[in-house]
């Protein structure tokens, strides 16, 4: 019934199993991949024809985590999986990026790749497993694909690089790096690091590339038994070949002249005019203008790339290493907790930092369980930033990806919760863009956080590198423009401090690059980063001495764990009363840490005093404020120190004989009491008689320690 094939290898100490022919047999390619007890179903399907007029390659990657994979039932009203989470979007991008450049340049059929996590063992990263599985599914499908691709995750634990660390091991790692590529070279890198050197980062990339070679061999071995016949690729017709030559001849000078304009918007206008003029000439000659559209894009790339390689001068007139002019400003928004405006050439980010309390932490429900994050970084890219009309609304995949990259760059420098008990949210509004907006976000975020008073040990900066690579040579570009990104072969983003790298993301648009090019790019990026940090230092060099006056003032105290329930009270009654009484926000953790957020010191001290009163043990001889909760013939019960009650015997209500308790106090009265002892059952004995109810002063000496007995006076 099944035409079943299986390939198993031992990889990084665990079995990796690739299976095909049993599940999802109607997909062009389907692989069930197992690593440890993590299981992912990966499929690849391609449309058999191209949609008329389509001049791009429509590749879609869907990554989905099923709750049942971790033995869970989804939350929410509908109890089923909904829209992709941020983690799912990021993992889909992780799969897309190394796969996309390996399809033929003239391939236009729609391709859909799906990775469904069916089982998760809390050890082996499902994103890594999914990327390998999707590569295998494509390799088997017959769809034109210059793979296979594989990947590895590299950690650095106790100073040693580790291949595919488990979920628990990565928590103690100073590096979390994912590297993907073919047998020939690296295609993608994504990492977060604790200020590591460029040499260490390159060593990790090299180790990753070496470590996944057995996986590529396993995919090839599976394909030898189970791959479908490859699709035929349409070759260029004689008409298309002739048209391409004519486009190059007619358009070369027109396009080169247009790209002499240095300013972005003016250049775009001249390029559009050049394309219109080329189309006019082609139309006058009776040639197919629609067919020439992709050829015009190719011509544009040839002109720009050829000029840079030949002259060493870039689109905006810079040489290969020069960074665009930078202006950094801080404190530009009066009511924000921290703000910055970072401008680099025609790229600009308005970044705002907001400080909150533990109640503002983001709750994330992931396969590995629910956890909280006290740092959020959100990146917004409105269409006006590039002078266009477009969609506004919820963030797209690109915005989520750029925000996460900036998050990785800043995260290693953040203080611990114990040292800085605030929740931090940073929002980057890209107000202008001409390349490297994610790296502008890194620079602006660092400045905004320091402006808010977050004690970053060192500022963080980022730079985007590019590559032009042809048979006759290559050029590594610092601080690339948008056009250099689109028309180049590499987008290599490096962020870090003066001491080392904190984040690295590399995407290659050609089949691979050499370690030599990576080394040059990393060194050039370091030079650029140091320059940018110097420009940022003109605005701010370190966090302000205290948090913004607009931010809440947070104080932390600790209470014994056994007293937590007393502070919270039944149904949260006590903690709500503390909040109402003080005006401060109060949050208590499972370990007894109480976080108090207030707009001024008075509110904080009122909350602290009330909490300390609740958790304190009554001391004999000490005076407390309380409330009468019940009266009886023999006295009154007074609530004090939070939930604690004590008895004021009728003889201790007031000086002299008291006929009825209600003659002195009624339920609900606020009173001042002194602890005079404990009975044989440990109950607290209180006295109002020895306390001045107006001032709270102890008047034992004047009224006597016991009722009816005036104090003994020494004879004169």
Curated annotation (Swiss-Prot):
PROSITE patterns: KH_TYPE_1, S1. It comes from the Bacteria. It catalyses: RNA(n+1) + phosphate = RNA(n) + a ribonucleoside 5'-diphosphate. Involved in mRNA degradation. Catalyzes the phosphorolysis of single-stranded polyribonucleotides processively in the 3'- to 5'-direction. This is Polyribonucleotide nucleotidyltransferase. Its cofactor is Mg(2+). It is found in: Cytoplasm. Its EC number is 2.7.7.8. Residues 552-611 form the KH domain. GO terms for biological process: mRNA catabolic process; RNA processing.
